[in-house]
């Protein structure tokens, strides 16, 4: 199969769809891999490394889309890419369609096959292609929250760890999944007093056993969240409903319960966000203030650490990319029900129920 890896063009997105080591696995199996010129530079991979892995370098993004049957990316296509996607082409990347009507319409119109990393789902309910970026995003959420607590950045002027004789910052994590656990562990490691809220009692029991002593668990209800807000310094929103929009757990009205300078980090912004007042931001302009509360809502948090992120992503996606290239998407999805759950749009039709429900296409 002809596999293409274009350069990501989203704001400050320095990740790339595959490492040279991943490319080498595909070319070793006889597949033709084309990489756009400088696609890997942001992640620390030169064109020469891809050539040594057996790839050929194409000069433009247009050439990659034109010549390749399967496109392996990190981010969803954005508007300049819409017209490059063609009928029958397989796109293997993150999409997050539920909060992107324009993207959904463009991919339906293109006639492409859209296989989304974020909805590939194992029988135990885990999301193997979302997990590596969730682990990165959770850790970064805690670090960014700590950074913006500085008074010079608009925060309360608190050191997350405190010092002897001075209490540490208090961190509330909404959602006890992969992102939430990673955020809680990082914040706890920095010395914060952490509370992690979830609606699953079995998950809360597991977190209670497995996380450090300065991580506490809380059943997630509106009342319990409200009671936490007056004394919290950082809130990390990490709720996930696979393939669907995220519910708003903190409303605009609830902002008044928090002290000015509190930092909200919305990791779920690519699925609509956990906070009613969230709107997408970028690495260039990551924060804004509403009602005295800082909002950090960067949709591609792992893009700030692209070398780590690209290695982690390729580790997870490669086996599926190989199956798709070896067998074609139809046979690969027939053989692997987990991969089949990644099918969101197929040649003009929405085939993932949660997305169809959002847009009334059921």
Please give the residue ranges for each predicted region.
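Glycine-rich phosphate/diphosphate-binding loop of Rossmann-like nucleotide-binding domains
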Residues: 6-42, 152-240, 287
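Generic hydrophobic/aromatic pocket-lining and core-packing "Φ" positions
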Residues: 23, 47, 104, 142, ...
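Rossmann-like adenosine-cofactor binding region
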Residues: 209-291
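Adenosine-phosphate binding glycine-rich loop
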Residues: 118-144, 148-159, 269, 274-362
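An N-terminal-biased, well-structured beta-alpha scaffold segment characteristic
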Residues: 2-106, 110
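Short glycine-/small-residue-rich Rossmann-like dinucleotide-binding loops
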Residues: 69, 75-76, 95-96, 239-243, ...
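Glycine/serine-rich phosphate-binding loop and adjoining beta1-alpha1 elements at the start
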Residues: 2, 8, 77-169, 298-300
